[in-house]
Amino acid sequence: MSHDSSPQPLTAAPGAPLRGRLRPPGDKSISHRSMILGLLSQGETRVEGLLEGDDVLRTAAAAKALGAGVERLGPGRWRVQGVGIGGLGDPADVLDFGNAGTGSRLMMGVVGGQPVTATFDGDASLRSRPMRRILDPLTRMGTQVLSEAEGGRVPLTLRGPREAIPITYETPAASAQIKSAVLLAGLNAPGVTTVIEAAATRDHTERMLRLFGAAVSVEPHGPGGHGRKVALTGQPTLRGTDVVVPADPSSAAFPLVAALIVPGSDVVIEGVMMNPLRIGLITTLLEMGAQIERVAEREEGGETVADLRVRASRLNGVDVPAERAPAMIDEYPVLAVAASFAEGRTRMSGLHELRVKESDRLAAVAAGLAANGVRHTVEGDDLVVEGDGAAAPGGGTVETHLDHRIAMAFLVMGLAARNPVTVDDGAMIATSFPSFLPTMQALGGRIGA
């Protein structure tokens, strides 16, 4: 899917309660990593429940270009034949990641630590996003940046060393992508590569490295033990394995909030990953008074998963602490929508990282709230939403800036607002939730062109 094609406006209108069951798409973080670690393993990796959105398919194509055998066996079922650490080949063409920030940054870590040369590129949105924070530690590990666009952006070309240099690196920002890129580069380093982070970020890379056979230790670090010290022993033999991808909590967030704010709704969301570093939104919504019940907890793909029963609820404003941001960085747009229907003030603190997402997501959320009559202020890196317990006015058109989460968040608003809400383009929703429209329509949601 090209992000340069003509826009596809969508409108959501209020209607009947949402009812039914759904399973959101597979988790994007685990889907990317299953392809990447499958590439770096010896033997075969089989993946069930892969998210077949554009972002992950770009990562799969890059793994194939670097030498892996990649085959789709059926819906969500894939086989990856790995080449092992050090076995990558130079790709014949540019690695085009489209809109995939995660896939591109993680694969920079892979290429940056191996004796291979590759050029990375993407769409207009990806070309605007900073890569310097990834390139800085990689150059310390021996990666050469042969060419780059201004400001360390794609298109850029990397050449990795015969062996990476093991380093100890303190991340300058709470970013699982920086941590993961360094650890992936460290797979081809003789010795221990250590990443120190001031606040714990999502730990899928560490969990999945262990699943594939790497030795990774994680210890609390810093004041109050809020940070983490992650150490990887380099040059392991990774073994292909079977991966069952749980449902993505960041995608589950949209039907979840919709069920909370559309009166009379009662929805069950199946198989959602409950990793403690990914459920900041659920924690926050429970504090706001949401009726969310966890049932049938079980293990899948090295992660705890559960079914969530969600019923329409009266919500109250809360303060969301900055240290929760890493556990819900992708969920703030839809939390802002929930806050628009709550009684009282909701303050979301420390949202600096939202400014370097697919769009300046903080500015995009604020503009969307303004277009739909929601009282709010942006104070530095804080977003404050003033709700009066009634339905948001709605009636506006939201500029998505090619950002799938902005599009879905404001379509959710439209299902419960007093007036329909339009987003200027819904095409990019396919990057993370290809079945969003039919899924919401099956629950009774009125969304269409």
UniProtKB/Swiss-Prot annotation:
Pfam families (UniProt xref): EPSP_synthase
Chain sites annotated for binding 3-phosphoshikimate: 28-29, 33, 175, 177, 330, 357
EC number: 2.5.1.19
Domain of life: Bacteria
Active-site positions on this chain: 330 (proton acceptor)
Protein function: Catalyzes the transfer of the enolpyruvyl moiety of phosphoenolpyruvate (PEP) to the 5-hydroxyl of shikimate-3-phosphate (S3P) to produce enolpyruvyl shikimate-3-phosphate and inorganic phosphate.
Protein name according to UniProt: 3-phosphoshikimate 1-carboxyvinyltransferase
Native species: Methylobacterium radiotolerans (strain ATCC 27329 / DSM 1819 / JCM 2831 / NBRC 15690 / NCIMB 10815 / 0-1)
